[in-house]
Amino acid sequence: MLRIPVRKALVGLSKSPKGCVRTTATAASNLIEVFVDGQSVMVEPGTTVLQACEKVGMQIPRFCYHERLSVAGNCRMCLVEIEKAPKVVAACAMPVMKGWNILTNSEKSKKAREGVMEFLLANHPLDCPICDQGGECDLQDQSMMFGNDRSRFLEGKRAVEDKNIGPLVKTIMTRCIQCTRCIRFASEIAGVDDLGTTGRGNDMQVGTYIEKMFMSELSGNIIDICPVGALTSKPYAFTARPWETRKTESIDVMDAVGSNIVVSTRTGEVMRILPRMHEDINEEWISDKTRFAYDGLKRQRLTEPMIRNEKGLLTYTSWEDALSRVAGMLQSFQGKDVAAIAGGLVDAEALVALKDLLNRVDSDTLCTEEVFPTAGAGTDLRSNYLLNTTIAGVEEADVVLLVGTNPRFEVPLFNARIRKSWLHNDLKVALIGSPVDLTYRYDHLGDSPKILQDIASGSHPFSQVLKEAKKPMVVLGSSALQRNDGAAILAAVSSIAQKIRMTSGVTGDWKVMNILHRIASQVAALDLGYKPGVEAIRKNPPKVLFLLGADGGCITRQDLPKDCFIIYQGHHGDVGAPIADVILPGAAYTEKSATYVNTEGRAQQTKVAVTPPGLAREDWKIIRALSEIAGITLPYDTLDQVRNRLEEVSPNLVRYDDIEGANYFQQANELSKLVNQQLLADPLVPPQLTIKDFYMTDSISRASQTMAKCVKAVTEGAQAVEEPSIC
């Protein structure tokens, strides 16, 4: 099997600067001059010919080269002529030398590319009309621009057996040109050595050697980086052509990272979801749940208002009847008799509208499903509940301590950043919690929360590692805060972070304390003053309970009085809707322009890609209409006015794609000393231990047939998933 060794043993890679692992930063005086088609350009020593050409805007054709992967140099499509050199060179792998004149469009360069393209097409099936890559295929584009206009190959073409690597990625291996991008992505970015090559020459094949599922939460990205149609999306197969779809730039809400995405739609239906570049968040990758769970947007949807009748059955009704029923209850009960719970997929506009509505009936019992300790600093200080170092900041860290989290399946793109830094920057990682299968080596310190006390006191050996670190990070998973001793865990982590700042070489602007959230709405809800957890509702059960997309099962009918009136507003008939007396159908994230705040405190917007199904409406509009019928009209009629209200309550919520720094760690640590709670002996066990736990975590992914197939393939094998035969 071909393997690209990219471990720290590679000299030079570990010292590479952020963003590009193949160039070496030098002083300006050390720049060297080269010429590209006679045009002068100053570059750093070690820059490749291809990078020098791109610096002057000259695009060199390539198949195997990718900016975020190691150099393979095996497709030879990037051959260029160097003046006075005896042979053409591979631009992606050849470092420039002073005074070189690179000829990108000489006759020798053109002839070399034509020859390479002719060899690549010799065994290619040329089945573009039935290939899902058609219209966005590098092989199509480059054969058009750099290939010959006819073929001299008259022999029989080879055929390669397709591989079954799971329900997400479709393989047509006869189209494969052995660029090895997928292999390098799996080994370097995903950290899963499942893919490789067997055979040599004409018999070379890319595959898993033993037929098995490609076990990665980032597997769908090999579809994007494949330059031909060898790897395509199984759920998307034969459904649309790229020029038929409308593309909408948006963000993902399946986790708390806020990955930037492109939603492709046709005839009012989401056809597929692709990644969008954002260097500070997801780079150009997205998780499989982000990419493939979109079919859950078409199933189990709430499309019309519903009311529970005298027989106890939910029946369809009109908006007027449903809103009048809810308004009547709000007029009958006020104050502590009215409460609300916000779920994990709720946007900031709906959160502020619901807050204003309940405040107008003299209620402040607004809760989130996720628990966050309120003892000590609680949620009063914003730096106490953010990933303060930022996602991209991981690349600057030299030590990371993970506490009670499995970032690989809770927040895959954050985990990919940790692996990137571990691979190239000698990052040292340690974990307190259940041992999990991460994509990098780490020191397992144990699973007892009491280890935190030992580290804080300095008696644990790892205390010295943190003390010697220049840029340490302590990352506490939000799942650990759901425990009964969550406040004590938070206080212990805060103490560790503050002692590191005082005793190590940490500079003033480096932030050690970090909270890693799992759901998209939590940070915005805390910014708006929602109470974390539903304990207040359990202690004082209300007469009217508003469930805003609350499908986490944090509260049941048994927790409430029999006469409690429950309103569910959301987009899926999942956990919350069956217990409701009135259902108000809302819009999903692809159907509204809405604000979400990710785990690092960065506000971003989703955009309208399709209209909500049936009679469903945007959440803030439903709440606004309800307030008018109830006689407590909210003072906004448009989205801009709602966002003005957001700005009044929490200005950072409308500073899009910007992170407002928070630095109250010393104050938070002082307040944490007031926490009167003991750490329990129970081990720290994150809820998502294996990849099986990754696929179905919210109302959208639980409604997805594709995600259900993934769970079945993981538990029973890829062969257990029956795929429809397409002729």
UniProtKB/Swiss-Prot annotation:
InterPro entries: 2Fe-2S_ferredoxin-like_sf, 2Fe-2S_ferredoxin-type, Mopterin_OxRdtase, Mopterin_OxRdtase_4Fe-4S_dom, NADH_UbQ_OxRdtase_75kDa_su_CS, NADH_UbQ_OxRdtase_ferredoxin, NADH_UbQ_OxRdtase_Gsu, NADH_UbQ_OxRdtase_Gsu_4Fe4S-bd
Domain spans labelled 4Fe-4S Mo/W bis-MGD-type: 245-301
Positions bearing N6-acetyllysine: 84, 467, 499, 709
SMART domains: NADH-G_4Fe-4S_3
Gene Ontology molecular function, alphabetical: 2 iron, 2 sulfur cluster binding; 4 iron, 4 sulfur cluster binding; metal ion binding; NADH dehydrogenase (ubiquinone) activity
EC number(s) from the headed UniProt entry: 7.1.1.2
Catalytic activity: a ubiquinone + NADH + 5 H(+)(in) = a ubiquinol + NAD(+) + 4 H(+)(out)
Binding sites annotated in the UniProt record for [4Fe-4S] cluster 2: 176, 179, 182, 226
Cofactor(s) listed in the protein's UniProt record: [2Fe-2S] cluster; [4Fe-4S] cluster
UniProt binding sites for [4Fe-4S] cluster 1: 124, 128, 131, 137
Segments traversing the membrane: none
Keywords: 2Fe-2S, 4Fe-4S, Acetylation, Electron transport, Iron, Iron-sulfur, Membrane, Metal-binding, Mitochondrion, Mitochondrion inner membrane, NAD, Oxidoreductase, Respiratory chain, Transit peptide, Translocase, Transport, Ubiquinone
Domain of life: Eukaryota
Residues that, per the record, bind [2Fe-2S] cluster: 64, 75, 78, 92
Enzyme class: translocase
SUPFAM superfamilies xrefs: 2Fe-2S ferredoxin-like (SSF54292), 4Fe-4S ferredoxins (SSF54862), Formate dehydrogenase/DMSO reductase, domains 1-3 (SSF53706)
Transit peptide: 1-23
GO BP term (any one): mitochondrial electron transport, NADH to ubiquinone
Topology class, membrane: Peripheral membrane protein
Record's cofactor remark: Binds 1 [2Fe-2S] cluster per subunit. Binds 2 [4Fe-4S] clusters per subunit.
NCBIfam families for the chain: NuoG
Subunit and partners: Core subunit of respiratory chain NADH dehydrogenase (Complex I) which is composed of 45 different subunits. This is the largest subunit of complex I and it is a component of the iron-sulfur (IP) fragment of the enzyme. Complex I associates with ubiquinol-cytochrome reductase complex (Complex III) to form supercomplexes. Interacts with MDM2 and AKAP1.
Family recorded in the similarity comment: Belongs to the complex I 75 kDa subunit family.
Cited function: Core subunit of the mitochondrial membrane respiratory chain NADH dehydrogenase (Complex I) which catalyzes electron transfer from NADH through the respiratory chain, using ubiquinone as an electron acceptor. Essential for catalysing the entry and efficient transfer of electrons within complex I. Plays a key role in the assembly and stability of complex I and participates in the association of complex I with ubiquinol-cytochrome reductase complex (Complex III) to form supercomplexes.
Protein name: NADH-ubiquinone oxidoreductase 75 kDa subunit, mitochondrial
Organism: Macaca fascicularis
